[in-house]
Amino acid sequence: MTFAATILTLYPEMFPGPLGVSLAGRALAEGKWSCDPVQIRDFATDRHRSVDDTPAGGGAGMVMRADVLARAVDHALETRPDSPLLAMTPRGAPLTQARVRQLAAGPGVTILCGRFEGIDERLFEARPIEPVSIGDYILSGGEMGALVLLDACIRLLPGVMGAPDSGDEESFESGLLEYPHYTRPAEWEGRTIPEVLRSGDHARIEAWRNAMAETDTRLRRPDLWERHEGARAQSPSGARRQKKER
C-alpha cells in the first residue's frame, strides 16, 4: 500500500523538497509513498485568486479565508476520504512520536499549510481538521512543519529504514530520550568510549543504555521524565511497586 501525502499549500514547489533525497527520496521513487501538493489558489473564485483578507476586529497581517480553504479541503476529503486531515498551526496539539506512528500506519495524510496570521477559526469548526504543532515557535508558514511531519511518518513505513527494528530504540519510542551513541576511534582527544560498551556483555550494555536514557531524560527533558514516571506509576507493575513501598 502506498502512503499518500496530499499537501494543501500556497507553495506547491516546496514539495517534495528535502523529502526527494535520502531515505524519503528513495522511498518516493520506489512508490512506498506519494506526494501530491495542491495549490490552494486554484480554489479561489476572484480574478486575483485571493486566499486571504484583513482580520476581523483589526490588527496586523492577513488571515486565510474559510470559504477558499473549505473548497480546497472538501476537494481533498472527496479525493482521499480515508486520510486524516491535519493543519499545521502553532495553536495545535504538539506532534508526538505516538501520533506519528498512528499516522504512518494509515493510508496517508492530508495536510493544510497555514500562512500569514493564521486561518479563519470557522474552518476548524466546520470541517474535521486536526490542528498540529511541531513546537513552540513561529515559522513563515506550515510547509516546513508539513515536511517535518511527513519525514517522521515516511521513515516508519515498511522497508524504508534499512533494519526493520532500527527505530525501536530511538528517542521518544519508550517515552524517554535515546541513550548516547559512540563509534570508532576508541579514543578521541583523550576521551574514550565507555568500557561497558566495549565489554561485549549485552546485559550490562542494555542496563547501561537504559540508565543513561533515564538520566538524560531527567536532566534534559524534565517534562518528558514527569510524564514517563506518571505512566509508569499507573501501569500494573508500577502500581504493585508503589503498594509494596507503602
Swiss-Prot record:
| Disulfide bonding pattern of the chain | none
* A Pfam family annotated for this UniProt entry: tRNA_m1G_MT
Q: Does the keyword Ribosomal protein apply?
A: no
Regions of compositional bias (Basic and acidic residues) in chain numbering? 219-231
- Which InterPro entries does the record match to this protein? Alpha/beta_knot_MTases, tRNA_m1G_MeTrfase_C_sf, tRNA_m1G_MeTrfase_TrmD, tRNA_m1G_MTases_N, tRNA_MeTrfase_TRMD/TRM10
Listed under subunit, the entry gives: Homodimer.
What is the protein name stated in its UniProt record? tRNA (guanine-N(1)-)-methyltransferase
Species of origin reads: Rhizorhabdus wittichii (strain DSM 6014 / CCUG 31198 / JCM 15750 / NBRC 105917 / EY 4224 / RW1)
